[in-house]
Amino acid sequence: MENLASLLKSHKLSQADYEHIVQILGREPNLVELGVFSAMWSEHCSYKSSKKYLRGFPTEAAWVIQGPGENAGVIDIGEGYAAVFKMESHNHPSFIEPYQGAATGVGGIMRDVFTMGARPVASLNAIRFGDIRRQDEIGKKHRYLLKGVVAGIGGYGNCMGVPTVGGEMSFEDCYNGNILVNAFTLGIAKSDEIFYGRAEGIGNPVIYVGSKTGRDGLGGAVMSSDSFDDAANQLRPTVQVGDPFAEKLLLEACLELFKTNYIVGIQDMGAAGLTSSSFEMAGRSGSGMIMHLDRVPMREQGMTPYELMLSESQERMLICAKKGYEEKVLEIFRKWELDAEVIGEVTSSGKMELFWHGEKCAEIPVLPVSEEAPMLDRPTKEPAYLAEIRSKGAQAPKEIDLKEAFMKLWSAPETMDKSWVYSQYDSMVQTNTIVGPGGGDGSLVRVKENGAALAMSADCNPRYCYLNPREGAKLAVAESGRNVAVRGARPLAITDCLNFGSPENPEVMWQFAEACEGIKEACKVLLTPVVSGNVSLYNQTNGVDIFPTPSIATVGLLPKAQKALLGAFKKEGNLLLLVGETKSEFGGSLYQKEVEGFLGGDAPVIDLHRELALWRFLEEANEAGFLESAKDVNVGGLAIALGKMSVLGQKGCKVKTALKGVDLFSESPSRAVLEVSSEHLAALESLAQKGGVALGVIGSVGGENLEIDSLSLPLQTLQEIYLRGFAKIVENL
């Protein structure tokens, strides 16, 4: 190969990597082989910088059917059914081309779920942008990016007939050069009918199904394993182009196939396309494979083996069928007007042998590529910025104008209702949505098959994680689980999407290592194992890294859907109770951001055992019928939580606390507001005492104002800002 140095640079391979490849092959690689190694050894596919930290996560429990290592995680939800779910990032593509980047992110995560045999029933997203309130070019750009991402998520999800039932948004300057788009999908399957990405049985046919292969997405996995600079727009050809109608056909064809006994395994073609799907299937099974690339359905002329192996064209799957059933498999996909071709077979060689019009164009041992990518032990160093920002302190002044402070927080984009966003999503399709977007806290979806409901929520406060990555990650796990618990459900498991800056920066690797320790500790205590996930590194532009953003999505089970607990006031005269203890904790808070205009101090400190006690208390109280509504206290503190419950329930409240002024906006964790009928108060207090949970009456529901201590605001005024304010910011009105 000519000009080896430039070739290695374009493939993001080092000289040491190249020498390792030569050692594996026993010769110099050709271009196809180099491309395969480049993709599979990329950060995006191999997790070479992060795997050592991920190994510490708790992944097992009695209810876990499948943990990390497959296309998605699987948990038992009773009566012979399972929930299949995962969250993944599509950050780099969405910054380059927001509509297609976000759309194909949704399509990719849905394929990960239905390739396991599950019908997708709900989606969430966690999306983060720069400051959309700015009146400069940065603000203008991020309003454009926001519009494109939201349109892409809605455009794909709506066509698939899968409801988008919730999500999370945040806005920080650290995302000015790198937005984050994290997509989550959950599906339902029979627990004894889960399909895996395997290719076993010598002589079994390998079948390509779905859309034709084009040149879109070429080099996508490698692109997602590097930082950006001002030339990022030139990477637009590496962004995949989605066709949701083709994916809808693929979904239905796959679900029809799963009712047969024709196949051994199936794998989505995601990052690195045909390369990753074939090597992963063979690698898991300890087998080899022969593939004839000239048989791959192509939509462009003159495509080469290199392009066919590395294209990331969407809506494609690779199937290992049972020998003799080839025609039956092909018949199903052709009925759904999809391409389907036998392109190879399983072998016992342990090698991937690729042919092009009868001539061998590549021969690579499977395991060194799929399972044995060189792992990196990158240096870590505590960031220099920590000493400075922690020294700023986070103690807010006690003498404040409560009304002025409340209105600043109430008018923040993080607080306001996002109907401008979720009105573009179909949240009710499939008619199973009990609590959708706009309902506050966790979303809730009915499982008609067993009468239960599944609660889900995606959460992370990147400001906490910047101040203290370990505590911030713990708080993300706890917040996500608490949003599920206030629906009356028991949190069972999590999927994560770990978004960080460049791993080549020792300070970023320190943040990553600390966050992983926090997740590990929280999941162990809270009994929510990690069953799937994703790592997105190199979220850096022109040397500026994003805040550590370990997005956590928790799934919980409510055995009886009719016991669903909502987050809006229900009845005038009901009592309001605060569960948990409030301290003066403002590091990384919305109050600190909006009122004081800085970021400093330390993140709130969480007692994980107290958090678990809160979850179990909420579950028991709801099961006993003691609760009318419940709301997590988090961003903006108690005052904002009460404001949201008032607006959502269209009822005011009268609250008196023992808190001093600004502590109404404290973000101490492990707290919730409960609405209860007075007849249940004594029993609830007894239950709280038994569970070791702090509980106190703070007021009642009623009136047309939000009244909290000396603060009194008309509900009508709050509704106007809450319901219409976000749209005004996005449209720059």
Curated annotation (Swiss-Prot):
| GO cellular component terms attached to this protein's record | cytoplasm
Q: Where does substrate bind?
A: S89, H90, N91, H92, R111, Q240, E312, S313, Q314, S536
Residues of the active site are: H44, H90
Which keywords fit this entry according to its UniProt record? ATP-binding, Cytoplasm, Ligase, Magnesium, Metal-binding, Nucleotide-binding, Purine biosynthesis
Major localization listed first in the record, in broad terms: cytoplasm
Q: Name one GO biological process term.
A: 'de novo' IMP biosynthetic process
Q: In which pathway does it act?
A: Purine metabolism; IMP biosynthesis via de novo pathway; 5-amino-1-(5-phospho-D-ribosyl)imidazole from N(2)-formyl-N(1)-(5-phospho-D-ribosyl)glycinamide: step 1/2
Question: Pfam families per the record?
Answer: AIRS, AIRS_C, FGAR-AT_linker
Write down the superkingdom of origin: Bacteria
Task: Please give the SUPFAM superfamilies that the UniProt record associates with this protein.
Answer: PurM C-terminal domain-like, PurM N-terminal domain-like
Q: What InterPro entries does this protein's entry cite?
A: PRibForGlyAmidine_synth_PurL, PurL_linker, PurM-like_C_dom, PurM-like_C_sf, PurM-like_N, PurM-like_N_sf
Q: Which HAMAP family match?
A: PurL_2 (MF_00420)
Subunit record text: Monomer. Part of the FGAM synthase complex composed of 1 PurL, 1 PurQ and 2 PurS subunits.
| Alphabetical list of PANTHER family matching this protein | PHOSPHORIBOSYLFORMYLGLYCINAMIDINE SYNTHASE SUBUNIT PURL (PTHR43555:SF1)
The identity of this protein, by name, is Phosphoribosylformylglycinamidine synthase subunit PurL
Q: Which gene encodes it?
A: purL
